[in-house]
Structure formats: C-alpha cells, structure tokens
Amino acid sequence: MQLITTENKLAGSKKALEIIEKGITTGEVNTLGLATGSTPETLYAELVKSDVDTTNVTTTNLDEYVGLAASDPNSYHYYMNNLLFSKKAFKESFLPNGEATDAEAECARYEEILTEHPIDIQVLGIGTNGHIGFNEPGTSFDSLTHKVVLTDSTREANKRFFEREEDVPTHAYSMGIKSIMNAKKIILLAFGENKAQAIKETIKGPVDVNCPASVLQNHPDVTVILDNEAASLL
C-alpha cells in the first residue's frame, strides 16, 4: 500500500489524475472504475481539462440507487453524465440499472459486465464508517455485486444531495468487496478531517469486516491519496 499525503483536495486529485493519465497513455488502462459522491468531483473536473484521450477507455461505476431513473438528478447516472460523460468521450460506460425490477438478475448482469471488462484502475472514496462503494460494515469480503440496505449513517451523509430527507433512497446496487478487489490497481481518495478515523482504521487497524476498507491491506496494488486533514491520525 502506497501512501501519498498532499496539501489539499486539488493537489490530491491531480496526483490521482497523473496515475490515471499514465495508465491510459501506456495502454495499461482499458477499463477505469469510477466512484461518486463529493470526493472524486475535483478529479473528474481535472480529467475533463486533461488532454488524455479516453475514447478507447471503458468505464464502470461502483453503485447506483435502487428506484431512481437515470434521468433523476439524484441518480448516479445523472451525476456521472453531468460531471464527466457529457464533457469527455469514453468508449462505453456501465452503471447498475436503478430501475431494474429483478434485483438478482440485475446484480448478475452487472457482475457479467465486470467479468467482460476487468477493471485496470478502480477509484474509491471512503465513508466515515469505512464503507467502500455501498458496502457497509459487516459486508462479507467475498461479496459480489448485490442489493444493499443503506445504513442510517450513510443516508444521513447523503441527504445533503436531496431536497428532503425522506427522498434519500433506502437501497442501492453496489459492486461487492470481492468485485472491487478484483481490480488490478486501486486508488483510494480521502479528503477532510471527517475521514481521518476511517483512514486510520483502514491503514493501521486489523483487516475486519467492521471496517470494509481495511480489506485493501490485502490488495497487491493500492495507492491511498489523502490531504493533511484526512491523514491527521496516522
């Protein structure tokens, strides 16, 4: 596990972009795994400004809310289109279908996509409870793409994106921890003091399902990029 501490979110995002650009330029990155939320927003803004050619790059996404149409402004389809896909051309892009009526079939479909498009670099954020994707504490390290019941703390953290608290979905489709660990390389981004405890447990704590991100200690190629605040407890 390589640890990089930067001055702020912009510097950290630029460092992540350097790794991604190099992988695309050398042809090592054919599939790029993407995350959502506030953490990668600056990375995507920098990627849009970059001259790197992404027209031969396929993207996959970690998760999507259950019950939201792709056109819903709170969906991750909408988020990705708004921040990245409408501004930068990719070969093809895959996300779970939030409107799927058969959850089991949708999870199997998405896992098949991940098998057909092995992820070369997976970008991750981390929740204050150590979740990666929507894999909450207690999730099996052997999990594949699955339907998740969102915890109160995760819904609380995400309610700022919704007009009303009751509008925050209760379920999501998420790549499983095993699905994430199948990526050849992982870049974990964390910025801000509120992520410091989760980062401490991820890097220095035991590998335990109560901190899902701690499983990254077992991955052969992880780069953790932090700002000074997120690194403050290390």
UniProtKB/Swiss-Prot annotation:
CDD domains referenced in this protein's UniProt entry, alphabetically: GlcN6P_deaminase
One Pfam short name: Glucosamine_iso
Active site: 63 (proton acceptor), 129 (for ring-opening step), 131 (proton acceptor), 136 (for ring-opening step)
Recorded metabolic or biological pathway in which this protein acts: Amino-sugar metabolism; N-acetylneuraminate degradation; D-fructose 6-phosphate from N-acetylneuraminate: step 5/5
InterPro entries linked to this entry: Glc/Gal-6P_isomerase, Glucosamine6P_isomerase, Glucosamine6P_isomerase_CS, NagB/RpiA_transferase-like
Gene3D superfamilies per the UniProt record, alphabetical: 3.40.50.1360
Hydrolase among keywords: yes
GO MF entry, a single one: glucosamine-6-phosphate deaminase activity
Superkingdom assignment: Bacteria
Reactions listed under catalytic activity: alpha-D-glucosamine 6-phosphate + H2O = beta-D-fructose 6-phosphate + NH4(+)
EC numbers, comma separated: 3.5.99.6
Cellular component, GO annotation: cytoplasm
GO biological process: carbohydrate metabolic process; glucosamine catabolic process; N-acetylglucosamine catabolic process; N-acetylneuraminate catabolic process
Keywords assigned by UniProt, alphabetized: Carbohydrate metabolism, Hydrolase
Family: Belongs to the glucosamine/galactosamine-6-phosphate isomerase family. NagB subfamily.
PANTHER family per UniProt: GLUCOSAMINE-6-PHOSPHATE ISOMERASE (PTHR11280:SF5)
Function: Catalyzes the reversible isomerization-deamination of glucosamine 6-phosphate (GlcN6P) to form fructose 6-phosphate (Fru6P) and ammonium ion.
Protein name, per record: Glucosamine-6-phosphate deaminase
Species annotation: Listeria welshimeri serovar 6b (strain ATCC 35897 / DSM 20650 / CCUG 15529 / CIP 8149 / NCTC 11857 / SLCC 5334 / V8)
Lineage: Bacteria, Bacillati, Bacillota, Bacilli, Bacillales
